[in-house]
Amino acid sequence: MKILVATGIYPPAVGGPSYYAKELVEALEALGHEAKPVTFGPLLRYPTGIRHLLFFLQLLRYMFWAERVIALDTVSVAVPVAFATAIFRTPFVVRTGGDFVWEQYLERTGELFPLKDFYTKTRIFSRKEKLLLHATSFVLRRASLIIFSTQMQKDIWVAAYHIDTMKARIIGNAVEAELPSVEPTKKNFLWYVRNTAFKNSARLHEAFNLAKQRYPEIILEEGQVPQKELFLRIQSCYAVILPSLTDISPNYIVDALRFRKPFIMDMYSGMAEQFKPYGTLVDPESIEDIVRAIEDLASEEGYAKALKKVRTFSEVRTYKEIAKEFASLLETV
């Protein structure tokens, strides 16, 4: 098959979505398919609307060639893809990432609650949020298939957007092979994320400061670094912490698992049940619960137990497996 992979960002841009797109393209090619990436990233310097039109025109150059299209988001990339594929009658599938409407709502209102509670009550949306809701609904109706990374998000979106369950599929994220770790020389907890509302910064910092009163030696490292640098830091760190309001499929925790490093993650994540046996789950709305988890890892006894748990992790899931699952689904549309 000739498969066009439309993505928001692509290397050399850094970030999980960039890495996912690159690995998917390469894995599809390794299976014998022709795969080409087309990226929205360079157009971000243009105003909203203009950049979407430019991306649509960019897509048209590839549509004479493409037999199938994979859109790796539900709005910025997927809306132009939906129009371009309609003109050429080319099937496309959309892979959901996060929930952009929920994220935007949290940023605007300052309200802080998990994704599971977002669609369960009537909310007053801004004009932008209403537009995002309509755009997402349009894409989900137009797509031949909708690919989720977790059952949790699938369940929420099927109910919220009235998705035909026959169109909804799950392709889990990759969990690559174990990487060698280094013994930590300090009690540093890593929180290298984009500081957006759903990452729950205020509660994390308050909890960490409270835990620091009992364990003054603990350190919170934060910011954003390229993946290569991040891996070096995880390799030698004490623990990884990610008490987000809801991280749907957190690659950050997957990276911690690959290095067999103790971790704290939110209990509402789409991967919470999968990773529960290997780490610590917290209620992201409870500062007390986050404090408890930090203090437990800061203690010698708690850390020894956490190391024992995380070292039992043995799951491996390759991008080749993911590419095979995509290809099998693309054959059906």
Question: What is the predicted role of each segment?
Answer:
Residues 93-131:
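Acceptor-binding helix/loop patch of EC 2.4 sugar-transfer enzymes
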Residues 262-265:
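Short hydrophobic beta-strand element within catalytic cores of glycosyltransferases
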Residues 57-60, 64, 87, 116-146:
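Membrane-proximal helix-turn-helix segments that form the acceptor-binding/catalytic region
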Residues 280-287, 296-301:
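Conserved acidic donor-binding segment of nucleotide-sugar-dependent glycosyltransferases
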Residues 245:
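Aromatic "clamp/platform" in nucleotide-sugar-dependent glycosyltransferases that forms part
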Residues 16, 301-331:
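A charged, aromatic-enriched C-terminal amphipathic alpha-helix characteristic of glycosyltransferases
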Residues 141-142, 148-149, 154-174:
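Helix-loop-beta element that forms the nucleotide-linked donor phosphate-binding surface
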Residues 4, 147, 174, 181-199, ...:
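Conserved donor-binding/catalytic core segment of Leloir-type glycosyltransferases
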